[in-house]
């Protein structure tokens, strides 16, 4: 299962306020819902691609939230600096194995 998510809640039209960290937490909140629907947990996640509008400014905060979310055994991850849609700071593509 692959999901590409942003910091825009499903019921919203703009990113959650609070910067890249808040957007990353919103992405993980949405992903938890998808994992629950698939009847798997975070250990099923095998890779993550992060797309950041401001890598230098935001990578430390995003890294901290990533570690909090995945704990001591995080999946493979790549981070890229990109030009995201207006107003967005983070986008993530998460891949999980469904057994």
Regions found by a protein language model. Give the residues of each.
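Short, polar/acidic, helix-capping and beta-turn segments at strand->helix junctions
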Residues: 1-99
């Amino acid at each position: 299962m692959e999901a590409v998510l942003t910091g825009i809640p499903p019921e919203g039209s703009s990113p959650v306020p609070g910067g890249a960290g808040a957007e990353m937490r919103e992405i993980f909140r949405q992903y938890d819902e998808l994992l629950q629907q698939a009847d798997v947990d975070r250990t099923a996640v095998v890779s993550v691609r992060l797309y950041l509008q401001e890598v230098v400014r935001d990578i430390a905060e995003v890294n901290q939230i990533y570690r909090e979310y995945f704990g001591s055994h995080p999946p493979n991850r790549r981070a890229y600096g990109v030009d995201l849609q207006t107003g967005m700071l983070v986008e993530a593509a998460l891949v999980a194995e469904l057994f």
